[in-house]
Amino acid sequence: MGVDPTPPADIEDFRQHHPFKLSHSLDDALSDRRIEGVVLATPHALHEQQALSVIAAGKNLFCEKPLTMTSEGAKRVVSACRRAGKVLGVGHERRFEPAFEEVQKLVSEGALGKILLMDANVSHDNFRRLAKDNWRLSPESAPAGMMTAVGIHMTDLFIKLAGPAQEVRARSARLIFQPPAEDFVSANILFKSGAIGAFTALSITPFYARFTIYGDAGWVEVMSKANVDQGKPTTLTHVDHEGRRTVVYEATDTVTQNFEAWADAVEGKASYRFTDDELSENIRVFEAIVKSTRNNGSAVALR
């Protein structure tokens, strides 16, 4: 079943090739006992209320990122899933990219030594084509520039690699876009491990994506040629004290892989690769970044 209160004009053409029942109300899906899980891909500000409704109806939940807009909201959703014995999936598909799976392997095996710095920039100008009143440009549903679009993926990877955060400083700015949209967000995150995570995401410049992790025994860098939906290859470079290794990975359908991993967890075939603590921690960091941008880049402590 598909639910959309305002479906696009070409929805019937799509349904001719991919038949499914269309409803205008989420309640129809929640009351259908045949439905075991619900995927939420709605404006971010609606996530928490809808997620809790899905769990209360006895369904497994897959929610597009960010899970919620606040850390308290994330706690409520994670706790509700845990109490109900349901599997919580989140749309952080970058962990499923072959290059980032290799990065996680290198870090977990100690190939980079102690992680010192994680530095990333993921930017694109897709938002130039959006109408001014699009919710993706709204400070209520999408605060701090591109934080909810791409920044939240980077912080997810940071947390996976370095653990929980201790302090956040962040700034956003508007030099080109007209209000309420913002041109970029840049954040500096101190982790409890002592590592630093720094990232920038611009919403006004052509595509660029680089993710680099530096350790005392080596560094690894991932360069993407295009956004995940474009099917372009990604290049990984690993340098240690013995030399340089470069690997080119062809694109894979990471969105589907994430859905399949969630479905496998629902069926008890495997554990989902995201922990509740990681999902909650990412929203704590997201909330702190938003707070810092709204307070001229002042430090926000995470306890």
Tell me the role of every PLM-derived stretch.
Residues 1-14:
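NAD(P)-binding Rossmann-fold cofactor-contacting core
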